């Protein structure tokens, strides 16, 4: 019998930052979930989350579906051994950790018309904005972040102003915690999940599917 497939978001679903746990939620960090660029622990699981992760890894096929890029997911300390959907769905990694070539070709074709627009948007906005790249030098989406979570009104005000300057046709805007992202409509977790599930069903047949997440972008899968 095929194992169930569990599609799960990562940040604020399976783990969260120490700051959020201690300062906002009064939770005790139990186990490292992810490290920062200097390889110091940054995000943690509660004991309950740790137990859930271990159970899912043993009883199901756990597939992360995350906004994290391919570099960021490499810093997650959960031993995934199946597929992974990263970068808001722009990249699908095989169990060997390599981009799926069929999905890569599809996404490169979909993103080609957005390259000039994304570059122009980033160039005309202040230093809060940056482009996220995958597949070498392919711009995938633009994101603005604020390090101070008590000043998110400033971030949202700038985001509102940008929406009046740049037409949002062909994009959708994802606001989550301390960041606002402008994503091309082909870059979407739900589209990547649907493609991967169709591929796996063609290979394996029927299997149960469960989705876990914390935001509207996760509702799509």
Predicted regions and their residues:
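Short glycine-/acidic-enriched loop or helix-start segments at secondary-structure transitions
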Residues: 17-18, 24, 73-76, 95-96, ...
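A structural signal for short, well-ordered beta-strand segments and their strand-loop junctions
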Residues: 7, 63-66, 84-86, 132-134, ...
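Short amphipathic alpha-helices and their capping/turn segments at secondary-structure boundaries
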Residues: 1-5, 73-76, 161
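Active-site neighborhood of HAD-like aspartate-dependent phosphohydrolases
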Residues: 1-6, 10-64
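Active-site phosphate-binding/coordination module
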Residues: 43-127
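Conserved acidic, metal-coordinating active-site core of Asp-based
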Residues: 124-221
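The start of beta-strands in P-loop NTPase/AAA+ ATPase cores
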Residues: 4-6, 81-82, 209
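Short loop/turn segments at strand-loop or loop-helix junctions that form parts
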Residues: 8-20, 87-89, 95-97, 136-137, ...
């Amino acid at each position: 019998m095929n194992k169930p497939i569990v599609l799960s978001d990562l940040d604020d679903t399976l783990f969260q930052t120490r700051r959020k746990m201690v300062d906002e939620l009064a939770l005790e960090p139990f186990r490292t979930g992810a490290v920062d660029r200097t390889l110091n622990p940054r995000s943690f699981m509660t004991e309950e989350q740790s137990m859930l992760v271990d159970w899912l890894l043993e009883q199901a096929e756990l597939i992360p579906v995350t906004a994290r890029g391919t570099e960021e997911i490499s810093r997650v300390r959960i031993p995934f051994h199946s597929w992974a959907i990263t970068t808001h769905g722009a990249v699908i990694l095989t169990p060997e950790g390599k981009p799926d070539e069929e999905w890569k070709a599809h996404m490169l074709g979909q993103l080609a018309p957005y390259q000039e627009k994304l570059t122009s948007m980033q160039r005309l906005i202040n230093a809060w904005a940056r482009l996220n790249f995958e597949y070498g030098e392919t711009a995938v989406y633009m994101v603005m972040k604020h390090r101070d979570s008590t000043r998110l009104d400033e971030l949202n005000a700038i985001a509102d102003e940008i929406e009046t300057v740049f037409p949002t046709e062909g994009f959708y805007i994802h606001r989550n915690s301390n960041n606002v992202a402008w994503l091309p409509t082909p870059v979407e977790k739900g589209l990547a999940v649907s493609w991967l599930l169709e591929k796996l069903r063609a290979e394996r047949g029927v299997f149960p599917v469960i989705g876990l997440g914390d935001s509207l972008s996760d509702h799509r899968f």
